[in-house]
Swiss-Prot record:
Entry membrane topology: Multi-pass membrane protein
Biological role: Fluoride-specific ion channel. Important for reducing fluoride concentration in the cell, thus reducing its toxicity.
Species the sequence originates in: Yersinia pseudotuberculosis serotype I (strain IP32953)
Subcellular location: Cell inner membrane
Superkingdom: Bacteria
Catalytic activity: fluoride(in) = fluoride(out)
Gene of this entry: fluC1
HAMAP family: FluC (MF_00454)
Activity control note: Na(+) is not transported, but it plays an essential structural role and its presence is essential for fluoride channel function.
Protein name: Fluoride-specific ion channel FluC 1
UniProt entry keywords in alphabetical sequence: Cell inner membrane, Cell membrane, Ion channel, Ion transport, Membrane, Metal-binding, Sodium, Transmembrane, Transmembrane helix, Transport
Family per record: Belongs to the fluoride channel Fluc/FEX (TC 1.A.43) family.
Amino acid sequence: MFNTLLAVFIGGGVGSMARWLVSLKLNSASAHLPVGTLIVNLVGAFIIGLTLALFSRMTHIDPVWKLLITTGFCGGLTTFSTFSVEVVYLIQEGKLTWAAGTILLNVAGSLAMTMLAFILVNNFASQ
């Protein structure tokens, strides 16, 4: 149990630091679209899809690594709460089109990235 908790703790810490650094660097790039949040959500969606697809095929790998990457790192990297508050701010500022675009890009983009990761692993594994 300790190894499991430690893996989630380490992964979450690294993911959270990565999210903060990306947001710090990229959110100022656009006054309307929180680019950093979008990037971490899309990258996190891809990583979790890739990890789950790989682990379903590579059952010999210790499941603690899966927890470190998915629950820990991806949980720390991706951010629904920041995404939510950024959309609310856009709505409060009357930027309804930007708010809708942010929602669409984050939700549809994250689903597409997760699906892409599964497709890539399945195509690679079938060769």
